[in-house]
Amino acid sequence: MSSRVGDLSPQQQEALARFRENLQDLLPILPNADDYFLLRWLRARNFDLQKSEDMLRRHMEFRKQQDLDNIVTWQPPEVIQLYDSGGLCGYDYEGCPVYFNIIGSLDPKGLLLSASKQDMIRKRIKVCELLLHECELQTQKLGRKIEMALMVFDMEGLSLKHLWKPAVEVYQQFFSILEANYPETLKNLIVIRAPKLFPVAFNLVKSFMSEETRRKIVILGDNWKQELTKFISPDQLPVEFGGTMTDPDGNPKCLTKINYGGEVPKSYYLCEQVRLQYEHTRSVGRGSSLQVENEILFPGCVLRWQFASDGGDIGFGVFLKTKMGEQQSAREMTEVLPSQRYNAHMVPEDGSLTCLQAGVYVLRFDNTYSRMHAKKLSYTVEVLLPDKASEETLQSLKAMRPSPTQ
């Protein structure tokens, strides 16, 4: 039994009837009170009536808080409309709408310096509501129920700038909202053009996805254009992605449907920095330095840092220890990121690097040049690990590449 309308076991049919009875007070205000809608919440909680009811009631509170009945007409700030990438374009073979997420050309820092995180997340909630609305239109058009959407994530150009903590938090919160409020609406999440950094990025958001959602993720290899046509008919797929669809003017990217983002002009900036919270606060004495060690167990991990100083600028560099178990000076270690002085007392600094080898990496905060003033340092340092399953998938896809002809 698929636990869908028309394919329910007697126990599931009884659970649906009891679920409807328990929700008598909510039925008049639900966005949809048919069996298809109610079964989404039951499937999401394995037909546990109490858990399903709790989930749906929390969703109705969320709808009220976010004014979801009117969100489709809400217009986000201009900078989000112009530079936040993505778009609804085409339908899969069963008529489900397809939404493209363009990650590489996204300027996360520019967007978050120009708009609030709440507006960034609200725009993504609006996309979810638009997709449900599109499903309803498809249901009316095709004469059969369409209740799921397909998402394509184009990861070409994914880089360390996309791992900036405030930007990652937007996607973490979005996937958390998706799981709690839009169960059983994602048909597949297809990843194309995934670079080596993808497993690290995925590991940052996967804990916010249910196991069911993770099972729906499909990572395509080098022949992704051909593989994509197994999900979406070529006439419903832009030329840019291996199909035959173009804009009316012949543009292969279908710019009238998909926003490809881009760098946000500084004229949109509302502030020079995003307010951050730091995990540690230390004093770096005059004429001294502070070393923060992080052990990297295998290549491919990413070191990510954020820091601010009080009392003046501070030097910063990254080094790799050459001897384990003992303190080393900067000149005794291998320089990975050259040390330089940062005006972190004026603008907080953040950055990251991919560790190419295992070992102990030292983030060195340098105040040796200051003979008069100690510096108060606030900082957060994290080691981002790659998701092993997706890393192995990428490696296996790479191994399947045909050898170049001689």
Swiss-Prot record:
GO annotation, cellular component aspect: cytoplasm
PROSITE patterns, per database record: CRAL_TRIO, GOLD
SUPFAM superfamilies: CRAL/TRIO domain (SSF52087), CRAL/TRIO N-terminal domain (SSF46938), Supernatant protein factor (SPF), C-terminal domain (SSF101576)
Residues of the GOLD domain: 252-383
Alphabetical list of InterPro entries matching this protein: CRAL-TRIO_dom, CRAL-TRIO_dom_sf, CRAL/TRIO_N_dom, CRAL/TRIO_N_dom_sf, GOLD_dom, GOLD_dom_sf, SEC14/CRAL-TRIO_domain
UniProt keyword Transport present: yes
CDD domains to which the protein is assigned, alphabetical: SEC14 (cd00170)
Keywords: Lipid-binding, Transport
Domain of life: Eukaryota
Any one GO molecular function term: lipid binding
CRAL-TRIO domain location: 76-249
Function of the molecule: Probable hydrophobic ligand-binding protein; may play a role in the transport of hydrophobic ligands like tocopherol, squalene and phospholipids.
Descriptive protein name: SEC14-like protein 4
Protein source organism: Homo sapiens
Lineage, broadest ranks: Eukaryota, Metazoa, Chordata, Craniata, Vertebrata
